[in-house]
Amino acid sequence: MIIIFFYDFDAFFGTEERGQYFKRDNEQDNFLKIAQALFKHKNLTLRQIEKIFTNTRLSLKMFSHNEYVCPDVLFLLTYFHICESDLYEKICHKNYDIQGLVDQLENSIPQCIFKVDESYNKYRNRFFLFTIAQLIACYAVEGYAHVSLITDKEPNKNRELLFTAKFMDNKTLVEALEWTEHQYRGIFALSHITNKISLLENFKN
């Protein structure tokens, strides 16, 4: 994806200062995976793509080098902000309960991205589901509390979703949500990202 180099994302992700904190996080690769998946399956105009990249790059300027970003979630939210602004605003204002959010995400994102049983796109689609899981987990943060998204661990029993996903692979979502439970810096209130995007809008107005 040649266009991404025009925006010089490496100037943020590739700095020596940031590498001291997040060298193992593969931030730019994660960012690219989400961009490629969305642009492959969404019929976006060049203007929309340019706006998504521009807004993402400007939002990154508001993060310090030692501040956690979660670039794949940032990019997905920026896509919603540019292309599906009503959904984005309702996410920002937490107008949905968890089930409502999941329903809206499944309606917005092409179903082919959720398929993890096709070898060609299996890895990329699985990564996308992990990004969705992290977005949902961050949305579920309420102050110092966190809405439960999967059943508690029990001996000899698989954990299950506490919401219904019609199109997303349930097993992969459970794995992804279990993964988020063990990320010491990966779960935060979604406002950590949306405030940066909204602050950018204030500068424009």
Spans of features found by a protein language model:
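A short helix-turn-beta junction within AAA+ P-loop NTPase domains corresponding to the substrate/partner-engaging
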Residues: 1-3
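The feature marks long, low-complexity, polar/acidic/proline-rich intrinsically disordered regions embedded
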Residues: 7-205
